């Protein structure tokens, strides 16, 4: 009887997908075209983008994340509360690998254009975006979390110009826009992670 119950429980649990979780203590850094290795948009994994970094941060178009092999699953989508964006593991990060081997989780997040090199201005922006401290992410997140830059009718209503309305409507909330726009206001280090 016990073996029948155990077999039933094991079979039932095998049908479940992974549950949402909020692992913490992640070191967070940023990278882009000028400091990628080699410089440019090439990434090590192909998760449907043709080996090119990118993403707006929605669930359907997550921003590229680099990390250590085995830290997260290749092509895994996570939610980044400190950015209010979804990210997908698509690239390798040498410093992340060194940190991971010492027990420190570390993710490196793509900041911008896949077609334009932002040069030193982009590297300076990445340094300003890096919040310091340690943060939680959401693994196996729901698809309906809020995303920085999605259309918000209240914000659009309050917008003072047509340009602001257009930016709100198109969901433009990049971290870096060449040649030198750094959007440090798109980082929310106090946002909690939750399932």
Residues covered by each model-derived region:
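Secreted/periplasmic proteins
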Residues: 15-195
């Amino acid at each position: 009887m016990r073996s029948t119950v155990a077999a039933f429980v094991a079979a039932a649990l095998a049908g479940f997908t992974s549950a949402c979780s909020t692992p913490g203590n992640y070191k967070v850094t940023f990278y882009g075209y000028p400091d990628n290795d080699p410089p440019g948009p090439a990434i090590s994994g192909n998760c449907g983008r043709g080996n090119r970094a990118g993403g707006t941060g929605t669930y359907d178009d997550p921003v590229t994340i680099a990390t250590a092999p085995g830290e997260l699953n290749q092509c895994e989508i996570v939610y980044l509360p400190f950015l209010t964006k979804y990210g997908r593991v698509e690239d390798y990060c040498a410093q992340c690998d060194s940190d991971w081997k010492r027990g420190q989780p570390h993710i490196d997040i793509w900041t911008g254009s896949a077609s334009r090199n932002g040069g030193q201005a982009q590297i300076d922006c990445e340094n300003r975006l890096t919040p310091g401290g340690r943060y939680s992410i959401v693994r196996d997140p729901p698809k309906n979390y809020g995303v920085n830059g999605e259309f918000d009718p209240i914000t659009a209503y309050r917008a003072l110009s047509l340009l602001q309305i257009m930016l709100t409507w198109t969901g433009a909330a990049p971290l870096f826009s060449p040649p030198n726009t750094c959007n440090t206001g798109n980082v929310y280090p106090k946002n909690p992670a939750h399932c």
